[in-house]
Amino acid sequence: MGAIQARLPLFLSPPSIKHHTFLHSSSSNSNFKIRSNKSSSSSSSSIIMASIKVHGVPMSTATMRVLATLYEKDLQFELIPVDMRAGAHKQEAHLALNPFGQIPALEDGDLTLFESRAITQYLAEEYSEKGEKLISQDCKKVKATTNVWLQVEGQQFDPNASKLAFERVFKGMFGMTTDPAAVQELEGKLQKVLDVYEARLAKSEFLAGDSFTLADLHHLPAIHYLLGTDSKVLFDSRPKVSEWIKKISARPAWAKVIDLQKQ
């Protein structure tokens, strides 16, 4: 789970979806059904349940990462909102899915997983023949390069980007005051990371080569929130980074993730 969620245990559970489960066909965001979690067994029995279940909220950066992967892989799934404002993530039912009381958690048949990056890699490997090839199964060198940039995202980019998004975006949502000194420090750190990205993207269209991979996808949630802030200049001032962001943000799968936030 990302730094934003770690610091915001009540991270945005939209009231409009608090008591509902969404069934999605990843081919179209307009093709989904809503059933109340309180509905009777007779009414719910008419709904075909997806084998993949995601427990989370669409505004969560970590949940967004998993949802984007599901859409890229063209997989049907069921999104089960977790009412974090009511403390559902700390209740026994959710702790059985994620003992740390965080989101998201994923169920695929009899398999239960937590930690968003572990979930996305599982989906990319397990469903390698479906949808986009997010991890190369043919070339060990490409796969190794993808793994390098997956680590870079998790160890270098996200710790700074997520904390910066917390300062720039989420503090305001929760009536907290942005710390200008923290913003300055985090932007300084992120600039150095993005300088490395600029050099890398001068050599290849995407981080792991000429194809979109999980390494690119993992960046989308934090970037999405920062693009709406003054920190956008960090990306815009680097031509290759800016071009890369435009490409990955324009993917249909990502548009569906953003649409979910409006449901």
From Swiss-Prot:
Coiled-coil ranges per UniProt: none
Instruction: Provide the tissue specificity.
Output: Isoform 1 is predominantly expressed in leaves and isoform 2 in roots.
Q: Which InterPro entries match?
A: Glutathione-S-Trfase_C-like (IPR010987), Glutathione-S-Trfase_C_sf (IPR036282), Glutathione_S-Trfase_N (IPR004045), GST_C (IPR004046), GST_Phi_C (IPR034347), Thioredoxin-like_sf (IPR036249)
A GO cellular component annotated for this chain's UniProt record is: nucleus
**What terms describe the molecular function in GO for this protein?**
glutathione binding; glutathione transferase activity; peroxidase activity; salicylic acid binding
Stretch forming the transit peptide: 1-49
What Pfam families does the annotation carry? Answer: GST_C, GST_N
Q: Which residues bind glutathione?
A: 60-61, 89-90, 102-103, 115-116
All residue ranges annotated as the GST C-terminal domain in the record: 139-263
Q: Tell me what turns on expression of this protein.
A: By salicylic acid, ethylene, methyl jasmonate, auxin, H(2)O(2), metolachlor, and the pathogen Hyaloperonospora parasitica.
Q: Tell me if Lipoprotein is a UniProt keyword of this record.
A: no
Name the principal localization, coarsely classed.
Answer: plastid
EC number(s) per entry: 2.5.1.18
Phosphothreonine-modified residues are where?
A: 177
Similarity comment: family membership: Belongs to the GST superfamily. Phi family.
Descriptive protein name: Glutathione S-transferase F8, chloroplastic
Q: Which organism is it from?
A: Arabidopsis thaliana (Mouse-ear cress)
Q: State the gene name recorded for this protein.
A: GSTF8
